[in-house]
């Protein structure tokens, strides 16, 4: 049963990541530094994908594309959440980071054990901090990626009247 679960989870989670990648790759280079809304959504999607894949959660999160935490309401316009990128990273940097995080996800799912399925991803001690079983944080993460991939596709349609096609499933299997 675990094998079927891991295979199904990866093919769909990988497809969500591939959808995000396709949207980022399609965004015209000419708009990369001028239309920061697209960049900030793409960055947020990637940084949170990596963050939620940091299992077990230890509170430490070194990112390949560094950020600074900001106080609520102090973020630059368009930034989602409190992780503000230290600069506008290039499309190439973003795609490389996404490829590395995709592999991190694939390997994690491939090596997932029954024992790990019982563990919890706990963000912190506060009442409203996230506290999920490992399978649930993986589903949550996949939904989060797909949500923002859809937002990027909408921005693509608005800006260039084009968007990537549907990704049915990821190619590689765990």
Residue ranges and their predicted role:
Residues 1-11:
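Extreme N-terminal tail/first-helix region
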Residues 10-14, 21, 29-79, 123-174:
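Short, contiguous alpha-helical
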Residues 13, 17-20, 24, 98, ...:
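Hydrophobic alpha-helical core bundles mediating ligand binding, dimerization, or RNAP-core interactions
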Residues 24-28, 109-113, 156:
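A structural signal for long alpha-helical coiled-coils and helix-turn connectors
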Residues 77-120, 135-146:
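Acidic/histidine-rich alpha-helical segments that form the ligand environment
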């Amino acid at each position: 049963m675990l094998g079927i679960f891991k295979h199904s989870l990866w093919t769909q989670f990988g497809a969500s990541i591939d959808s995000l990648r396709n949207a980022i790759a399609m965004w015209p280079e000419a708009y990369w530094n001028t239309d920061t809304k697209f960049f900030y959504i793409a960055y947020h999607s990637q940084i949170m994908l990596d963050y939620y894949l940091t299992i077990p959660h230890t509170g430490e999160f070194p990112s390949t594309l560094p950020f600074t935490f900001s106080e609520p309401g102090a973020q630059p316009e368009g930034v989602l959440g409190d992780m503000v990128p230290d600069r506008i990273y290039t499309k190439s940097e973003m795609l490389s980071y996404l490829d590395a995080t995709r592999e991190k996800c694939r390997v994690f799912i491939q090596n997932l054990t029954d024992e790990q399925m019982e563990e919890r991803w706990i963000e912190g001690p506060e009442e409203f901090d996230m506290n999920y079983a490992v399978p649930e944080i993986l589903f949550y993460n996949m939904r989060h990626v797909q949500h923002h991939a859809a937002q990027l596709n909408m921005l693509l349609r608005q800006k260039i009247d084009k968007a990537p096609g549907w990704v049915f499933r990821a190619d590689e299997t765990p």
